[in-house]
Amino acid sequence: MAKTSTSPVAPTRLWVKAAFTGFRRSKHTQNSNQALLKLQNVNTKEDVAFYQGKRVVYIYKGQKKNGSNYRTIWGRIGKAHGNNGVAVARFAHNLPPQAIGSVLRVMLYPNRA
C-alpha cells in the first residue's frame, strides 16, 4: 500500500491582527470611546475601506475566585485615520488603558460584498 504524502498546511485564520495604538485625541481632549488600530499588512487608507464594518475583539484574562477565564470586549471598525492604514474603532465598553500596545483581532466577517 502506497503512502501518500501530504504537505503541511497552515491553519486558516478568520481574523487579522491589529495593534491598539491609543485613543483618538486632539490637543486637549481624548475620546476614550474611539480606539486607533494599526492593522497588519494595511498601509493605505484605501486598504482600510475593506475593513470598515468588520467586528473587532479585545481578548483578556479576567481573574475570578477559582483560576481565571477569558473575557472579551467587542467593537466595530468605523473609518480610516490618516493615510497610513490606521483605523478608528468604537467598542461596546471602552478599552482599558492597559490594552495600549496589545494585539486585537479583526474578524473577516461580516462580509460587505
Curated annotation (Swiss-Prot):
Keyword set includes Ribonucleoprotein: yes
Gene Ontology biological process terms, A to Z: translation
GO molecular-function terms, A-Z: structural constituent of ribosome; tRNA binding
One of the record's GO cellular component terms: ribosome
Entry annotated with the keyword Ribonucleoprotein: yes
The entry's keywords: Ribonucleoprotein, Ribosomal protein, RNA-binding, tRNA-binding
Coiled coil residues, start to end: none
InterPro entries: Ribosomal_eL33, Ribosomal_eL33_sf, Transl_B-barrel_sf
Family: Belongs to the eukaryotic ribosomal protein eL33 family.
Protein's recorded name: Large ribosomal subunit protein eL33
Organism: Tetrahymena thermophila (strain SB210)
